[in-house]
Regions:
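Conserved glycine-rich cofactor-binding loop
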Residues: 14-15
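Rossmann-fold cofactor-recognition segment
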Residues: 48-63
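C-terminal helical subdomain
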Residues: 175-176, 191-231
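Active-site-adjacent segment of SDR/Rossmann-fold oxidoreductases
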Residues: 124, 140, 161-172
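Conserved glycine-rich Rossmann-like NAD(P)H-binding loop of the short-chain dehydrogenase/reductase
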Residues: 29-45
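Active-site helix of classical SDR
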Residues: 117, 151
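Substrate-binding pocket helix/loop in short-chain dehydrogenase/reductase
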Residues: 93-94, 101-104
Length: 233
């Protein structure tokens, strides 16, 4: 699909990956709207993207997440897609995580990333896309990351079911199942410390794959055998 007709909303644009994606889309001529939690970071990303429309949101307020989609469609004169880059992590054995942290992870990694596409489905038309980042933990959940992995698996399952529902609609549902990316994300865990991790994928390579997948109308980005990332249509 062409990705520059009307515009794309990037929730989570104040994170390293979301900011890089929004900037890349802007550089390719896409009209972007950016949304995030940190207002100062959001203002910087907006300026870098040619003073793109920007809106702060609280991922715990699911109605606000949904309203952000309507806001973006109004600001951009329509909406072709939403790419959700929101996320949080925690480390530690399941018995040490606690229900408060578990609720946080499921809200930030599943419920909020579902709220944006859910609201976007009636807005984007044929040729549009809804997309969200999950992770390789969906396929192989590691010890010490049970709740994080479960929250990402919930989002992955939801995306796959919605993809089936959207068959014939012309709307693409893209799951971005990334490996470890060098964003510093693991160092911002809400609980615990990350284990020793191998060198992650450069942010630019992850962004390249996401943009290529959006352009191709793909359904999945995942680690590849002969390349860091594969794109499946």
């Amino acid at each position: 699909m062409p990705i520059s007709r009307r515009g794309i909303l990037v929730p989570g644009a104040t994170g390293t990956l979301g900011a890089a994606l929004a900037l890349r889309l802007h550089e390719q001529g896409v009209a972007v709207a950016v949304a995030g939690r940190d207002r100062a970071s959001l203002a910087r990303v907006s300026r870098a993207c040619g003073n793109a429309p920007a809106r702060a949101f609280d991922a715990y307020d699911l109605d606000q997440c949904a309203r952000t989609v309507t806001w973006a469609a109004d600001e951009l004169g329509g909406l072709d897609g939403v790419v959700v880059c929101v996320g949080s992590t925690a480390f530690g054995p399941a018995e040490s995580v606690g229900d408060v942290v578990a609720e946080h992870l499921f809200t930030i990694n599943a419920l909020a990333p579902m709220a944006f596409p859910r609201a976007a489905l009636p807005v984007v038309g044929p040729g549009g896309v809804i997309a969200a980042i999950t992770g390789v933990v969906v396929d192989s959940p590691p010890a010490g990351m049970a709740d994080y992995s479960a929250s990402k698996a919930a989002l992955s399952t939801w995306l796959r079911a919605v993809r089936r529902e959207q068959r014939g609609s012309g709307v693409t549902v893209l799951e971005i199942r990334l490996p470890h990316v060098e964003t510093g994300f693991a160092g911002r865990a809400v609980l615990g410390s990350a284990p020793v991790l191998p060198t992650g994928l450069p942010v630019a390579e992850a962004v390249d794959a996401i943009v290529a997948a959006l352009s191709a109308g793909a359904r999945l980005v995942k680690p590849g055998r002969d390349a860091p990332l594969d794109i499946e249509r």
